[in-house]
């Protein structure tokens, strides 16, 4: 299974109908979630440098998808460790990537990073998620836009409703 992932309709990061959003298209291939990132200076923290909080937000979303695609668990961020190695520049192309690593008791552990097209890593987050409790799965799934999603991936998401 691989291809375009559905997006949470209201997401600032991924929602296609959000005029103010980033409209990132999340992609999946076995054991890896990724998206292409090239943002303008509306999102800078310093001149020509993307705000670190925005970089973190992108990587947090990548981690969520990486966990879901490998575990079918709807997780929530509990703890993170973020490192910035180089400034992430506005107007420059990057790829944000993430992978599920393992489950330890109730902790779901994953990582995500932002790299350039040569593979140099600019930022990385190690994350610990926990499965959400008492979430109405149907309400959650109904908030997704599957219009660009590959049929096999759509079926994977909708299988939560069975």
Residue ranges and their predicted role:
Residues 27-29, 99-103:
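Short beta-strand micro-motifs enriched in acidic
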Residues 61-95, 101, 126:
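Hydrophobic beta-strand-centered segment that forms part of the acyl-chain substrate-binding groove
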Residues 1-41, 142-162:
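Non-catalytic linker/capping segments at the edges of enzyme domains
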Residues 36-58:
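A conserved, well-ordered hydrophobic junction motif at loop->secondary-structure transitions
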Residues 1-3, 89-90, 101-162:
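HotDog/MaoC-like acyl-thioester-processing domains
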Residues 20-22, 31-35, 52, 76-80, ...:
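A generic structural signal for short beta-strands and their flanking turns/coil linkers
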Residues 37-39, 84, 131:
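Hydrophobic residues in beta-strands and at strand termini
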């Amino acid at each position: 299974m691989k291809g375009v992932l559905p997006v949470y309709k209201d997401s600032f990061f991924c929602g296609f109908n959000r005029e103010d959003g980033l409209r990132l298209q999340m992609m999946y291939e076995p054991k890896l979630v990724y998206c292409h990132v090239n943002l303008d200076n509306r999102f800078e923290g310093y001149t020509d440098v993307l705000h670190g909080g925005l970089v973190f937000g992108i990587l947090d979303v990548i981690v969520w998808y990486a966990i879901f695609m490998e575990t079918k668990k709807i997780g929530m961020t509990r703890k993170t460790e973020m490192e910035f190695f180089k400034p992430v520049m506005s107007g420059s192309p990057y790829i944000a990537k993430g992978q599920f690593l393992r489950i330890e008791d109730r902790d779901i552990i994953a990582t995500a990073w932002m790299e350039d097209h040569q593979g140099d890593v600019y930022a990385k987050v190690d994350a610990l998620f926990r499965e959400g409790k008492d979430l109405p799965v149907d309400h959650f799934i109904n908030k997704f836009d599957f219009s660009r999603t590959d049929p096999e991936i759509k079926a994977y998401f909708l299988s939560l409703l069975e």
